[in-house]
Amino acid sequence: MINIHFSNNLCKQFHRGIKGHDIVNDLFPKLKNETIAAKVNGELYDLSREIIENCTFEVITINSEEGLEIIRHDTAHIMAQAVKEMFPDVQITIGPTIKDGFYYDFATNHNFSSDDLEIIEKKMIEIINKNESFIREVWSREEAIKFFSSIGEDYKVKIISNIPSNENITVYKQGSFTDLCRGPHAPSTKTSRAFKLTKVSGSYWQGNSNNERLQRIYGTAWRNEEELKLYLNNLIEAEKRDHRKIGRELELFHIQNEACGQIFWHTKGWTIYRIIENYIRKKLENNGYIEVKTPILLNKELWEKSGHWDKFRENMFLSEAEDKTLAIKPMNCPCHIQIFNSKIRSYRDLPIRMAEFGTCHRYEASGALHGLMRVRGFTQDDAHIFCTESQITSEALKFCNLLIEIYKDFGFTDILVKFSDRPKNRAGSDEIWDKAEAALKKSVEVANLSYVLNPGDGAFYGPKLEFTLKDAIGREWQCGTLQMDFVLPERLGAYYIGSDGKKHHPVMLHRAILGTFERFIGILIEHHSGKFPMWLAPIQLSILTISEDSINYANSLKIKAEEHNIRVELDTTNEKINYKIRNHIHKKVPVFWIVGKKEVEENSVSIRYLESNKQHVMPIDKALKTLLTCASI
């Protein structure tokens, strides 16, 4: 007999070898139809897997995140089976779950098309309707290699050769299909009814462009048709909001092959960039930050001292000059320590909040580049806070409050925080880790932010907070970070003179709010669908003339608005007014002033807003006052 413990403090004895579905039927009959797997001693188990030792037991239902991931894993296997049955010469490689879905990579000379996806989906439905059981088997290494070699699955043989010799090799079967897999899986294929294959793309074996080229089929799977429909509708909405499409339409930026992964900012896009930069600069000044500027090109010796050379060498752009190896900086932190080290610091000088709009470059594979979201050249709203251990809590709280304030101004109020605490292998004493972790917890709690814990996921040099924004269509974007660092200041010789007259290494807080300007602007474009808040809009006001008689008056209005720092576009073209209105709606300008003979005579304007088809007349002084109110944050 074995003892099995449950979350409700119940402990019950069962025969050794009992299976999860028997326990569910016995103790949780109401959850029978919703249960998809179990967690035994913290490890996910198939419901058909035998339990052979004392353990804890937790039911995993389809309504949980873990349950949903299992559904997606099941669907990936079903897709692989369908592809293999339809295209027998295909070799299957890997098929993991990802956010919102799954993919599988295939080695084949056949070029998959959207028409193929429809046919594959039909075959998948056939497999699902057969209600095939997922069967787990444990094989020896020799058995696994022999089997997959015999059916021509060379990539599976390669994977097996990299599995540590002390690990079990598990396979799963459903119907005629067998795949190498750790599991777990649902009892059968019937839970994978709500799915859609979404796209085909190229990939490489093991993600290395020097290896064989593969084809990747992506899909999504959900608990039911309602969730699937909502997700697919959001995909359509996301396509409409694509920052690359809107960026072209609004003439904000472009990218070209001659500067791969770098941005050509057009006037309107650069206007947004400068507005954000000036806004952040003012916020930093008001919160006690000093602004610095550090070199872009540095000798590799500094990167060797900091430890970045070993970890980031492959992502650095290098140059040779005067028999020295120089690296374009991929981050700013070592440079900020050089400024800290430029003179003797006292404990009375701390905290020092050192900010830089730091331009950095990192080599990203060309296939990973994506508009503004993934680039090679970028600018961070970077800052490093040098403080004492006793100042960690107050500095972390000040940062959280500043971050919330800034996100709110940009239209983000739904913020998720991930807290990563100490890993097993770490630098620094337990005492300083205790202080740092307590400080981060307190800062998010006092700031009234909810957080989830990522146990053991902190860096070896300190715990961290990651701040994720939820946009208008529910997508999550990780932007802000607050990372403690107990190591780099010591490694680069940073110290201050304490009240005891001795040298002490400061604690360094790496922090960012936007992340990078490029990516954050991309997020803003998609969040607002190009309809920026008025304070952020590159053109805030369009003045449209109805006839030639109103051109001089319109010019005077433009001058008056510009005197109040309003960004104005004047349209005096010889087009009908309805055409002009449609044109400026397409440009997503938030406010229109329409002027004709009547407005000239009355010293007024007809006001129309982007989100309304109504117009109303207002005296110019009142209209300007209203405009200035709308244009303020």
UniProtKB/Swiss-Prot annotation:
One of its GO terms (cellular component) is cytoplasm. Residues 242-533 are annotated as: Catalytic. Binds 1 zinc ion per subunit. GO terms for biological process: threonyl-tRNA aminoacylation. Keywords: Aminoacyl-tRNA synthetase, ATP-binding, Cytoplasm, Ligase, Metal-binding, Nucleotide-binding, Protein biosynthesis, RNA-binding, tRNA-binding, Zinc. Pfam families: HGTP_anticodon, TGS, tRNA-synt_2b, tRNA_SAD. It is found in: Cytoplasm. It comes from the Bacteria. Belongs to the class-II aminoacyl-tRNA synthetase family. HAMAP family: Thr_tRNA_synth (MF_00184). This is Threonine--tRNA ligase. It comes from Ehrlichia chaffeensis (strain ATCC CRL-10679 / Arkansas).
